[in-house]
Amino acid sequence: PLAKKYKARLCDSDTVKKVLPEFANGYGGNLVHDESTDINERILAGAIDNGDNIVYPILGYKPEKLKKLMQMFKDKGYEVNLCFKDMPANIAKGRLLGRFLNKGRYLPLTCISKAQGKVGDSFEAVKDFADAYIRASSEPDGSNERIIESKGNIL
């Protein structure tokens, strides 16, 4: 939705995975992780070279990595808008399960446990480095999105 709204290039390794034969409708997601990451980095480099608007989804639970990425975009002349969808771990786990049941994309529940609490802390650590940001929350089904806090003109 954001990429379409802003006519932006979506640079997402999960999207890349879908075109790799070894992905096997989601069952080989972990198998193609490194390959999809490499391909996505090339897509990102091309988008930057073209001056495209970019949507770059990232879990972002390591603030130092997130800030480094934000700095890279700023160094390339980009305005950095940070979006964070806040949700309790049980909701995130439910969405992960739904993603598997509906799309065949398997990710271990440990992905949620590993990031639990860290993503919000990371957002707090880097939000003021962004040109604009938004923290939003929604119902478990994704409806009724609410803005919790924001800075700048982001959406």
Identify the residue ranges that each predicted region occupies:
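Short hydrophobic alpha-helical runs that function as membrane-insertion/retention elements
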Residues: 79-85, 104-109
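Conserved beta-strand scaffold positions in the cores of enzyme catalytic domains, especially
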Residues: 10, 82, 133-135
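Short beta->alpha linker loops
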Residues: 60-64, 87-91, 114
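Conserved substrate/cofactor phosphate-moiety recognition/catalytic segment
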Residues: 2-52
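Glycine-rich phosphate-binding loop used to anchor ATP phosphates in small-molecule kinases
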Residues: 31-84
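Short, surface-exposed basic-aromatic patches at helix termini and helix-loop junctions that form
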Residues: 3-5, 67-81, 97-102, 127
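Conserved GTP-binding G-domain of TRAFAC-class P-loop NTPases and closely related GTPase folds
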Residues: 94-155
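Conserved nucleotide-binding/hydrolysis micro-motifs of P-loop NTPases
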Residues: 15-18, 86-91, 139-142
